[in-house]
Amino acid sequence: MKAIILAGGHSVRFGKTKAFAEVNGETFYSRVIKTLESTNMFNEIIISTNAQLATQFKYPNVVIDDENHNDKGPLAGIYTIMKQHPEEELFFVVSVDTPMITGKAVSTLYQFLVSHLIENHLDVAAFKEDGRFIPTIAFYSPNALGAITKALHSDNYSFKNVYHELSTDYLDVRDVDAPSYWYKNINYQHDLDALIQKL
């Protein structure tokens, strides 16, 4: 099982590259890597990013998005790594701007996936908040690759397009025993300021 850290965004709203922003002196991407490593669930943790940022990560396992799908958002990162690892049975996806994700959240979602896998033939297990799904904290089966490829070849790179074609189930973020901010995206500087005040 592989983990994909999505870190190829342009971070326009934040004002600088979010992957290298810090919480308590630790970069977002380093925090996420450390959390994923702590679960002992993954045989490989891969950072998915663009050519401009790739050399800035102090981490050996960085993959640049497929050149045919530059600037097509997070789906391009998932597509690129799935294509490179056709033998893999499962991929966990997390965005780099979710620095407070916990190992407990990852393992809880995995247990949810396993318990529903046979009965529902799930392709995707994701979290949801107030009925809104969070596609960038989710497990994806390789079966999702076809729908992702189709979306990338269309003019609509949204996860909704992909999810409509797949067997998907959701776990509520409140079902995780963790601080309420564990799944929050940091989109703006004031989001980070608010988070730091809570810590």
Swiss-Prot record:
HAMAP family: MobA (MF_00316). It comes from Staphylococcus aureus (strain bovine RF122 / ET3-1). Transfers a GMP moiety from GTP to Mo-molybdopterin (Mo-MPT) cofactor (Moco or molybdenum cofactor) to form Mo-molybdopterin guanine dinucleotide (Mo-MGD) cofactor. GO terms for molecular function: GTP binding; metal ion binding; molybdenum cofactor guanylyltransferase activity. Its cofactor is Mg(2+). This is Probable molybdenum cofactor guanylyltransferase. The keyword Transcription does not apply. Its main location: cytoplasm. The keyword Plastid does not apply. GTP binds at residues 6-8, 18, 65, 97. Belongs to the MobA family. Its EC number is 2.7.7.77. The lineage of its organism: Bacteria, Bacillati, Bacillota, Bacilli, Bacillales. Mg(2+) binds at residue 97.
